[in-house]
Amino acid sequence: MSGFYHKHFLKLLDFTPAELNSLLQLAAKLKADKKSGKEEARLTGKNIALIFEKDSTRTRCSFEVAAYDQGARVTYLGPSGSQIGHKESIKDTARVLGRMYDGIQYRGYGQEIVETLAEYAGVPVWNGLTNEFHPTQLLADLLTMQEHLPGKAFNEMTLVYAGDARNNMGNSMLEAAALTGLDLRLVAPQACWPEAALVAECSALAQKHGGKITLTEDIASGVKGADFIYTDVWVSMGEPKEKWAERIALLRDYQVNSKMMALTGNSQVKFLHCLPAFHDEQTTLGKKMAAEFGLYGGMEVTDEVFESPASIVFDQAENRMHTIKAVMVATLAK
């Protein structure tokens, strides 16, 4: 993986299809090695900074466990644990941390922040999530899809994303489709479509690789023949309450439920979600949604689908760690 050494991992379109495939192959090997007890530590002596301006469960745990497995040490800098952007500029933070650490992960707000870190740190910088892109999640998704459709190329798979596609997940899915040739369908209200410029760029690239990108409001035609149906949360605790009603009214028809799964016509269709999911009333927000909007038994996905054999969301969650490990090994190990 010498071609990746000291490279950044900021968004998928920074890579070629061959490079993306190499990362997925490395992730699969690292996963197999860990499960067989044959994993070789290739990051011994490395120090990694984890900057989290937004809290996280899966991303933090994935980076920490992956680093420990490979012999590296980590420092967690949480939302209140650093001066980045407050008392110290991003540029200066990058230059300080780059003198102390071998790699830096950033999870937070604007893409320009992680890009600035990468420009000035002098060490590999990895995007754990920004407002615009979530590339590590898509690596995990692609590995999970390969595992559940073995022997099929990506340009033989159909992935549907239902719900709000104007976010970092929608953007990174477009980039993934551009590189892999997936048949990607964003099934969403038009108000929730990604920016037209990114759609056009990714559509042109997808066609070159044997795939296509479709944006539609029509659920029946959009999900027909799908191999995978994917969704994400509609609201978050950080948003004002008045936004909740507006968002739910807009997206309610796009809930992933047994009817939508059946409309695919594929008895083997699988369900994907980047988590956390509001599929029941066992969370603070889930309880509020149920009480205020009558969303009992799930918001963006029903509990029935989430807990069904079609759901592979915990395979996805596990694969966050294996794919993140691949990114760190590829960029830090000689």
UniProtKB/Swiss-Prot annotation:
This one is known as Ornithine carbamoyltransferase
Q: What is its main location?
A: cytoplasm
Q: List the disulfide bonds.
A: none
Record Gene3D superfamilies = Aspartate/ornithine carbamoyltransferase
Sorted alphabetically, the keyword list is: Amino-acid biosynthesis, Arginine biosynthesis, Cytoplasm, Transferase
Q: Which Pfam families match?
A: OTCace, OTCace_N
Q: Which family does it belong to?
A: Belongs to the aspartate/ornithine carbamoyltransferase superfamily. OTCase family.
Annotated compartments: Cytoplasm
Give the transmembrane region(s): none
Q: Please give the pathway this protein is involved in.
A: Amino-acid biosynthesis; L-arginine biosynthesis; L-arginine from L-ornithine and carbamoyl phosphate: step 1/3
The UniProt record gives the binding positions of carbamoyl phosphate as S56, T57, R58, T59, Q83, R107, H134, P135, T136, Q137, C274, L275, R320
Sorted alphabetically, the Gene Ontology BP terms of this entry are:
arginine biosynthetic process via ornithine; citrulline biosynthetic process; L-arginine biosynthetic process
The UniProt function text for this chain reads: Reversibly catalyzes the transfer of the carbamoyl group from carbamoyl phosphate (CP) to the N(epsilon) atom of ornithine (ORN) to produce L-citrulline.
Q: Which residues form a coiled coil?
A: none
Keyword Cytoplasm included in the entry's annotation: yes
| Residues that coordinate or bind L-ornithine | N168, D232, S236, M237
What is the organism field in this record?
Escherichia coli O6:H1 (strain CFT073 / ATCC 700928 / UPEC)
PROSITE patterns attached to this UniProt entry: CARBAMOYLTRANSFERASE
Tell me its EC number(s), please.
Answer: 2.1.3.3
A GO cellular component term found in this entry reads: cytoplasm
State the Gene Ontology terms under molecular function: amino acid binding; ornithine carbamoyltransferase activity
Gene behind the chain: argI
Q: Which reaction does it catalyse?
A: carbamoyl phosphate + L-ornithine = L-citrulline + phosphate + H(+)
